[in-house]
């Protein structure tokens, strides 16, 4: 089984999507799902002394403008592991440009954690935490000499629109 191609994007798209975790919160290791084999591989260790502030992964059967699966960040109270599948509720969209390419990311919360039951939109997330995420992405490739431009945050509705678009891009790319 290849989770990227064989899993659906989610049980109730776009309200609830699957987040296939590649990188757990707190890690400096950047793992990626190998799109061909479906295995998790070590892409690199971050050059900067930063740690991912969220669980980070992809939404299965999606494709995005950066020529990769659509990224998703899941706010977790405790980190999970590479390969874990989380039912996640999109609450916002992080907009950034990575080396000239549009590289937007969905921000979500786990459906199965009652702590986040009232988190429905980006406005429910503390500004200090949003700033921490933005700071991480603004700086995490700095020692590699790569430029990241943070464009800011959008609401849950915009995130859901982009998820639906990413599903269509996947269908076009992989003729599904």
From Swiss-Prot:
PROSITE patterns: PPASE. GO terms for biological process: phosphate-containing compound metabolic process. GO terms for cellular component: cytoplasm. It catalyses: diphosphate + H2O = 2 phosphate + H(+). Its EC number is 3.6.1.1. SUPFAM superfamilies: Inorganic pyrophosphatase. Its cofactor is Mg(2+). Homohexamer. Catalyzes the hydrolysis of inorganic pyrophosphate (PPi) forming two phosphate ions. This is Inorganic pyrophosphatase. The gene is ppa.
């Amino acid at each position: 089984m290849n989770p990227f191609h064989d899993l659906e994007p989610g049980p109730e798209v776009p309200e609830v999507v699957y987040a296939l975790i590649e990188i757990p919160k707190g890690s400096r290791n950047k793992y990626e799902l190998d799109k061909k084999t479906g295995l998790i591989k070590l892409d690199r260790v971050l050059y900067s002394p930063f740690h991912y502030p969220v669980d980070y992964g992809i939404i299965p059967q999606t494709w995005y403008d950066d020529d990769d699966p659509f990224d998703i960040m899941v706010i977790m109270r405790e980190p999970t592991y590479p390969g874990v599948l989380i039912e996640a509720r999109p609450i916002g969209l992080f907009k950034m440009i990575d080396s000239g390419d549009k590289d937007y990311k969905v921000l979500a919360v786990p459906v199965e954690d009652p702590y986040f039951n009232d988190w429905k939109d980006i406005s429910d997330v503390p500004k200090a935490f949003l700033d921490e995420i933005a700071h991480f992405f603004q700086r995490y490739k700095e020692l590699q000499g790569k430029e990241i431009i943070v464009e800011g945050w959008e609401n849950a509705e915009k995130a859901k629109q982009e998820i639906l678009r990413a599903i269509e891009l996947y269908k076009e790319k992989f003729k599904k």
